[in-house]
UniProtKB/Swiss-Prot annotation:
One GO biological process term: tetrahydrobiopterin biosynthetic process
Catalytic activity: (4aS,6R)-4a-hydroxy-L-erythro-5,6,7,8-tetrahydrobiopterin = (6R)-L-erythro-6,7-dihydrobiopterin + H2O
PANTHER family xref list: PTERIN-4-ALPHA-CARBINOLAMINE DEHYDRATASE (PTHR12599:SF0)
HAMAP family attached to this UniProt entry: Pterin_4_alpha (MF_00434)
GO molecular function: 4-alpha-hydroxytetrahydrobiopterin dehydratase activity
Lineage of origin: Bacteria, Pseudomonadati, Pseudomonadota, Betaproteobacteria, Nitrosomonadales
Cross-referenced SUPFAM superfamilies: PCD-like
Protein's UniProt name: Putative pterin-4-alpha-carbinolamine dehydratase
């Protein structure tokens, strides 16, 4: 079974469509490997992170941008003064792929550091 260490050690694989999204059962298994707070709904996973101030929020957003660039897999983000909501979905397949969970695990690791 995949665990968080496995997910953070993996690299995203290019996905340009032509493969089906993860089945709900597999997505739920992978969701259990992430930190608490991630929600699975509407063919995406999302989590809202809270911070003490705007500077910490923006530092986190920029760190996510760096990880996203390295993985070539980008989330949708909504940002407020002391919060950031991160949503992953593989748009090319209209649902979730393992890439979404790999990146979510890496975002969790960033938040803990």
């Amino acid at each position: 079974m995949t665990n968080v260490c496995d997910l953070t050690d993996r690299k995203c694989k290019p996905c340009e469509g032509g493969v089906p999204p993860l089945e709900m059962e597999e997505a739920e298994k992978l969701l259990k490997q992430l930190e608490q707070g991630w929600q699975l709904a509407d063919n995406k996973i999302s989590r809202t992170f809270s911070f003490k101030n705007y500077y910490q929020t923006m530092a986190f957003v920029n760190a996510i941008a760096w990880v996203s660039h390295r993985e070539d897999h980008h989330p949708d983000m909504m940002v407020g003064y002391d919060w950031c909501r991160v949503e992953y979905m593989t748009h090319a397949i209209g649902g979730l792929s393992e890439n979404d969970f790999i990146c979510a695990a890496k975002v969790d690791m960033l938040f803990k550091s």
